[in-house]
Amino acid sequence: VQNPGASAIQCRAAVLRKEGQPMKIEQVLIQAPGPNQVRVKMVSSGLCATDAHLVWGEQKISDLGGIGCPAIAGHEGAGIVESVGENVTEFVPGDSVLTSFQPQCGQCESCLRPSTNICKKYDLIKSTTDVSTARTLDGQPITSLFGLGVYSEYITTTEHHVFKVNKAANLEHASIISCSVGTGFYSATNLAAVYEGSTCAVWGLGGIGINTLFGCKYNKAKHIIGIDVNEDKREIAAEFGCTEFINPKTLGQPVEQYLMDKFGGVDFAFDCVGYKPILDQAAVSLAIDGTMVIIGAAAKEVKFEMPAFNFLFNRKVVGGLLGSKKTKVAYQELCDMYVDGTYDVDRLVSNKFSLDQINEAFQTLKDGNCIRSIVVFK
């Protein structure tokens, strides 16, 4: 089913006019879907630190290329297909979909290889600077971050940036599956391949870290240590599999020393923050044959130190997007787990905001007063 007669839609979006300044709710034009594109009516969008670094001005959008601001941020979304362009065969209006920063064309060498989810057809940076689908009312191009820009009532994107999911899933909460849930869970179960009886440590218990804990639990790790300076994370960490909570501020000794003394190091060290001191700490907390997993979105200039000698004892460092899981499979699996009650996604949504409250929503992320905050569209 195609919609050749579809036209541009005027709707509201949170437009970032300059990094570091509050977003403004503006009327924008979302273009009709062209060939191999779909237009989606958004139901909800999650708030992720990757977008926050740009919104807060810690990184300039123009550094990624393209025009920079004005821009519409957001990549973690759920919605209903409103219309489709020519050549689209997988989607019809009414389909429930999740949006993804990790597109899959399904045909390139990488998409056909089971070991990676990095599609060669789509460059992440170029996707981030897309200006083809959103306009101001006077015709000025707007950057749609990650080729999506889901802080908008409607989006137009490629058919490879959206993925059909179980219609029984509550889309108001399912948006967080597309990034924080999927990234954390599959970083443990797929990328790291946590094994039964292992010892795992997770630094940073935000939206991704909590789901990493659950992935470790799902794969039957024995010791699952959650590390965070926010004591308020202790309760929910335990609910999602944490067997021991460490607050570095009150521990009384360096975390790496404690982990070495008590466990002989950890089999898996997950960095869910992306800051150098934590990366350094995780790197020297590994047991023999241990694996360090980099999940946090570190700035390009961030480097960490690990003695080269340590690698002689089969220690290794890995990283990936969405836990290196194929996006289509990941979203369908997780939505099915959500629907059947295996995965308590609802518990992870700690704060809900309207689009008009989006700046307030980002403040909860900055203050650490949330597991995952979402914007719900009415």
UniProtKB/Swiss-Prot annotation:
Transmembrane segments: none annotated. One of its GO terms (cellular component) is cytosol. Gene3D superfamilies: Medium-chain alcohol dehydrogenases, catalytic domain, NAD(P)-binding Rossmann-like Domain. Its cofactor is Zn(2+). Keywords: Metal-binding, NAD, Oxidoreductase, Zinc. GO terms for biological process: formaldehyde catabolic process. PROSITE patterns: ADH_ZINC. SUPFAM superfamilies: GroES-like (SSF50129), NAD(P)-binding Rossmann-fold domains (SSF51735). Its EC number is 1.1.1.347, 1.1.1.354. Monomer. This is Geraniol dehydrogenase.
